[in-house]
């Protein structure tokens, strides 16, 4: 099983890259992960609602192209309106995916969200939190949660939940 993180944006602060890299390094023995950075649409200084929709559409086309290029993989999209999963639920979903041999493309949309087309094609819509999180922080939180879920599946002492 492989998890590709398709994320819009590529100029992350050093602390984001450091945090992401740490969990990426830790998870590799348990789960093959890869990050695919997709260029964010160029934004106007004071974008209109129509501009925002256009940005989501442009980024959505790039996300779907990256997903299609990989062949067969489930499409999981992070979305504030998605289903919330506990870490244990995520561990179960990943364990099921590993048993079935499913690859996953996990989408972190742009600063203005994801396009309706990407949401329509999603196999899973997942909300990390009801809170609004800074876009760069989501990369770190996502990778930490993947690592935590896989540590549960491998009986690693990292997770000390219930």
Swiss-Prot record:
Recorded catalytic reaction(s): these are: pseudouridine(1915) in 23S rRNA + S-adenosyl-L-methionine = N(3)-methylpseudouridine(1915) in 23S rRNA + S-adenosyl-L-homocysteine + H(+)
Q: Does the keyword Transport apply?
A: no
- The answer on whether this UniProt entry bears the keyword Electron transport reads no
Which Pfam families is this protein grouped with? SPOUT_MTase
Subcellular location, record wording: Cytoplasm
Keyword terms, alphabetized: Cytoplasm, Methyltransferase, rRNA processing, S-adenosyl-L-methionine, Transferase
What are its GO cellular component terms? cytoplasm
Question: InterPro entries annotated for this entry?
Answer: Alpha/beta_knot_MTases (IPR029028), RlmH-like (IPR003742), tRNA_m1G_MTases_N (IPR029026)
The cross-references to CDD domains, in alphabetical order and at most eight, read: RlmH-like (cd18081)
Query: Where does it mainly reside?
Result: cytoplasm
Q: EC number(s) in its UniProt entry?
A: 2.1.1.177
Q: What are the GO MF terms of this UniProt record?
A: rRNA (pseudouridine-N3-)-methyltransferase activity
User: At which positions is S-adenosyl-L-methionine bound?
Assistant: 78, 109, 128-133
Into which family does the record put it? Belongs to the RNA methyltransferase RlmH family.
**Quaternary data:** Homodimer.
What's this chain's function?
A: Specifically methylates the pseudouridine at position 1915 (m3Psi1915) in 23S rRNA.
Name listed for the protein in its UniProt record: Ribosomal RNA large subunit methyltransferase H
């Amino acid at each position: 099983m492989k998890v590709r993180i398709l994320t819009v944006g590529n100029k992350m602060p050093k602390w984001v890259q450091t945090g992401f890299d740490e969990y990426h390094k830790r998870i590799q023995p348990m789960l093959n992960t890869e990050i695919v950075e997709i260029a964010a649409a160029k934004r106007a200084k004071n974008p209109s609602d129509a501009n925002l929709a256009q940005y989501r559409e442009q980024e959505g086309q790039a996300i779907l192209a990256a997903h299609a290029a990989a062949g067969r993989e489930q499409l999981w999209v992070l979305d504030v309106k998605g289903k919330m999963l506990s870490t244990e639920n995520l561990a179960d979903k990943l364990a099921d995916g590993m048993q079935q041999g499913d690859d996953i493309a996990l989408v972190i949309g742009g600063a203005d969200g994801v396009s309706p087309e990407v949401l329509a094609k999603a196999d899973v819509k997942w909300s990390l939190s009801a809170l609004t999180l800074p876009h760069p922080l989501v990369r770190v939180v996502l990778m930490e949660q993947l690592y935590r879920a896989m540590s549960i599946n491998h009986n690693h002492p990292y997770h000390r939940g219930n």
